[in-house]
Amino acid sequence: MIEDISKKIAWLKKNPKMLKGIFRGIERETLRIQKNGHFSKTIHPYLIGSSLTHKWITTDFSENLLEFITPTSDNIDYLLSFLTDLHSFTASKIKNERMWPFSIPYCFNDQTNIQIAQYGKSNIGKMKTTYRIGLKNRYGDLINTISGIHYNFSLPLFFWTNWENNQNKKNNTDLISSGYLNLIRNYYRFGWIVPYLFGSSPAISSFFLKDTKKKYKFKKNKEDIFYLPWSTSLRLSDIGYSNTNILDLNIMFNDFNEYIESFQNALKTPSKKFINIGLKDEHGNFKQLNTNILQIENELYTQIRPKRKTKDGESLLEALKNRGIEYVEIRSLDVNPFSPIGINKNQILLLDLFLIWCALIDSPKIDKTDFLLTTKNWERIIYEGRKPNQKIYINNNNETKTLIEIGQIIFKDLNEIALILDSNSNNLLYQKACKETQLFLKNPELTYSAQCLNFLMTTGIKKTGLYLANKYHEKFINKNYFNLNQSVLEQEVIRSHQKKIEIEREDILSFEEYIRNK
């Protein structure tokens, strides 16, 4: 079922420095709201900077959907304090608005007048907006206001080049890409534990449901909020932020070149469904960038993605093709409403341990049968993860074990890895986080989803959301900066606006020509 990795852990205990230098990055999305909880109708504030060119603060789908982006760092405290500084600066510029603390928005009706994010009159700016118009026409606008946390993670080069299993690989690029694909396949197999532990969207507005309430036995509270008693992360369900079945695209993460080829095919292959939408409206305005299965790489919504930093003018696929996988992006984290910045240190420590474990254990190639079973496991945890004696498939013979049984096996290894990481930093942080989180297995009421549901049922989503939003706002505007200061942040605002103007001046091609050349 799960490989015994005691020998691998013993090797790491002898070579603990192999795990020194883990780099991370965090992206946090949050909706700007009015004081009454309704969506903000204002454009992205000029005083925060240009959403096109600001290094750390931008927008996602809509004008009111903020996205905070930290630089990469091997220091967790630096990352969290940097993210806090970005929130504090933003709060100081939107004094009459608040930042919504949940992944799922509060919707008082289905006509929320969502303004798609605008990035100016440059070709790249128009392209970003047109892509979002395409998302609206393909999947709807409300669904795209669901927010999350993206956690970027990379293991040290020293680990990949010295780990005993990698000694015979031909070159560093191949072995690193192969290693990350192994990690990704195992994340699909066992990553359901992340929404079990940290899922924070057990309830959803009725406007998101459409016909799905017929399929699942949802209950409803007084606010017209639908919930399932054992659910963990409806954001990750087919109700929420999921648009493409990677099985249909034949993207299996088994081989690097096959992954690139399958991804490219999805970007080039027309979709009958999207052809029916049309490329332009009657006035000649674009309704989407193209009618292919994916408009651009970002449209592939998966639980985890291989990534590489891009150079100017380079696409993600080109970067991957040219230089291999550099890190993985974890996309299955809900916003943690119990943290002002949407994520806490314990979550990061636990994710580190789990992702290292995914890199260590044996990772057989996945076929379609395997993938269907892993998908069923994710679905079970998403909809009924806290159900007593919940079962998980462990092989393609339909054999099952309880979530607790599998979870205990995983945590046994995580505790061993925690010892190694703590030995590098001379503290007990990883062990403490591991032991505290392990309690969630036998005590599902400790999970974030259970705590969220309790608040939503007793206090309501609007009242709870506004209470937390106001509490965090006061905390942000009264907090001193940690790593950044007011001057640095104000200078970045000025620089971002100047850079946006430069980009607009440098455009030569018409937008049509620009799109054709992409």
From Swiss-Prot:
It comes from the Bacteria. Keywords: ATP-binding, Glutathione biosynthesis, Ligase, Nucleotide-binding. The keyword Nucleotide-binding applies. It catalyses: L-cysteine + L-glutamate + ATP = gamma-L-glutamyl-L-cysteine + ADP + phosphate + H(+). InterPro entries: Gln_synth/guanido_kin_cat_dom, Glu_cys_ligase, Glut_cys_ligase. GO terms for cellular component: cytosol. Gene3D superfamilies: 3.30.590.20. One of its GO terms (biological process) is glutathione biosynthetic process. This is Glutamate--cysteine ligase.
